[in-house]
């Protein structure tokens, strides 16, 4: 959009005071982009199911594969994506690697999402 088009749009604004307040409080584009990328990771149902399981208890790939009726390879692939996105962390105990949520915020985000979904179903 050209500067002239932007100026024209601003002159069409009805509520300048609202625009000013919102502009002042709007986050910068970079964190908004990062949040949208986070939601893309959440957007896969397999990853969402893994997050739900790990919100209950840490688990190894083998147990996650059995729980979700998937191959270990498929689970490992999804865990790699979750780990790269800093949603999941791992710890090794002997030969077994256990996965858990990276922090409580991840579970909180899902709890709010489930609250929203259940609210829509009930109302």
PLM regions and their residue ranges:
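N-terminal leader segment of winged-helix/HTH proteins
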Residues: 1-42
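N-terminal helix-turn-helix DNA-binding core of bacterial DNA-binding proteins
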Residues: 27-73, 97-104
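Generic structural signal for conserved hydrophobic packing positions in ordered secondary structure
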Residues: 43, 75-78, 113
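Residue-level detector of secondary-structure transition/capping positions
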Residues: 58-59, 83, 114
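Alpha-helical residues within the helix-turn-helix
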Residues: 66, 77, 83-84
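Beta-hairpin "wing" of winged helix-turn-helix
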Residues: 83-93, 100
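Conserved segment of winged-helix/HTH DNA-binding domains
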Residues: 100-123
């Amino acid at each position: 959009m050209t500067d002239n088009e932007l100026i024209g749009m601003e002159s069409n604004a009805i509520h300048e005071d609202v625009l000013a307040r919102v502009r002042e409080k709007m986050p910068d584009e970079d964190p908004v982009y990062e949040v949208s990328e986070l939601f893309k990771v959440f957007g896969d149902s397999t990853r969402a199911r893994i997050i739900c399981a790990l919100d209950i208890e840490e688990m190894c790939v083998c147990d996650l594969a059995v729980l979700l009726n998937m191959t270990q390879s498929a689970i490992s692939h999804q865990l790699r994506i979750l780990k790269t996105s800093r949603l999941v962390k791992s710890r090794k105990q002997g030969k077994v690697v256990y996965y858990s949520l990276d922090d409580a915020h991840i579970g909180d985000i899902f709890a709010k999402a489930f609250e929203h979904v259940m609210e829509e179903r009930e109302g």
